[in-house]
Amino acid sequence: MLTFDITNDFIVGDRITKETLNKYSKLPHKIKAGLFLLCVEGSVQASINLAKYTINKYDFVTLVPSNFIQFHEISDDARFYFAGFSSEFMTNINFIKSTMSFLPVITEHPIMPLEESVAQLYIDGYRLLIRAQSLSPSYSMVNKNLVIAYLTIFMQGTAELYKNHSHWTNGIRTRTNEIYRKFIQLVVEHYTTEHSVSFYAAQLNLSLPH
């Protein structure tokens, strides 16, 4: 299985382009890192967790660990700002537990269209982080407490964006959504001792094919 992760705790930049995305266009990739992307130019057609989307200018994309993504049609002028956090770093800070309340909503709706004024605020934030990173000798030298602060900013900002879409966060919950919520809760409670698929399937009253 093809996967995507990053070696440093944190990366940030403004130059994800068509050339970059084409590397992930032939086959789906499993995301191991946490990624926050903002489209600032062009458009992209992509599949995220098997659902097809069109990503346009000022769309904010949240990809969490275990998401799958494949890019299809990519405009020549496509460009994204991005921030990424490694799988190792996110595991160490217990990412699943800290995002459990809205992780299912992000998984079902990974793309959030932003108003231009809000998008500009995010662009300013990315630029500030890019500037801060340029002052460090290398990415590997970034203080872990700072990285935790960066991730907290992105997660809190993302949570607020989704709270403003009540038809997503407060709508009728599908069975799939409910199963996913319960699964996340079980993982948080038992992940240190239980690693068997059959255990979680039994707790959810599901047969293994599910």
Language-model-detected regions and their locations in the chain:
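Generic protein-terminus/edge-of-domain signal
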Residues: 1-56
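Short beta-strand His + acidic residue motifs that chelate non-heme Fe in jelly-roll/DSBH
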Residues: 45-47, 69-74
